[in-house]
Every structure is written in C-alpha cells, then in structure tokens.
C-alpha cells in the first residue's frame, strides 16, 4: 500500500514538471503570434510605444555625454 502511494506521489511530481515547459511553450507561441500578426492594432500600438519609450530613455540618458570634451588618457 505504501509503495503504491509512493508511486502516485512520484508520478504526480513527474507529471508536474512537464507542465512548466508546456506553459512556457504556450506563452512563447502566443508571443510569436502576437509579434508576427501584421494586422494587429494592439501589437503596433504597444511596439510603437515601446520604441518611443526606449528612444526617450536613450535621449535622456545619453544627452549628458559631451562628445567634444577631451578624453582622459588620450
């Protein structure tokens, strides 16, 4: 009886492990479909807002660099 209980728990834990790759696979499949759907307004909006935010971040963080200043050690 104890051996059958151990078998069930081992099988249960063995069955739980593949669920994570399935969920990750479903998530990756959804991301791929979302990224490759050319007629999706939400994708275009999110992508454009993300690119805009990245551009604003770069402009704000790289504007402090003075490219004409003499470089140390040169």
From Swiss-Prot:
Q: Where in the cell is it found?
A: Mitochondrion outer membrane
- Transmembrane as a keyword? no
Keyword Flavoprotein in annotation? no
Entries under Pfam families matching the protein: TOM6p
Q: Where is the composition biased (Low complexity)?
A: 1-14
Q: Name one GO cellular component term.
A: mitochondrial outer membrane translocase complex
Q: Which UniProt keywords apply?
A: Acetylation, Membrane, Mitochondrion, Mitochondrion outer membrane, Protein transport, Transport
Q: Which GO terms describe its biological process?
A: protein transport
Location of N-acetylalanine modifications: 2
Q: Which domain of life is it from?
A: Eukaryota
**Region span, Disordered:** 1-24
Q: Which InterPro entries does the record associate with it?
A: TOMM6 (IPR029182)
What family does the database annotate?
Answer: Belongs to the Tom6 family.
Q: How does it assemble?
A: Forms part of the preprotein translocase complex of the outer mitochondrial membrane (TOM complex) which consists of at least 7 different proteins (TOMM5, TOMM6, TOMM7, TOMM20, TOMM22, TOMM40 and TOMM70).
Official protein name in the record = Mitochondrial import receptor subunit TOM6 homolog
This protein's species is Bos taurus
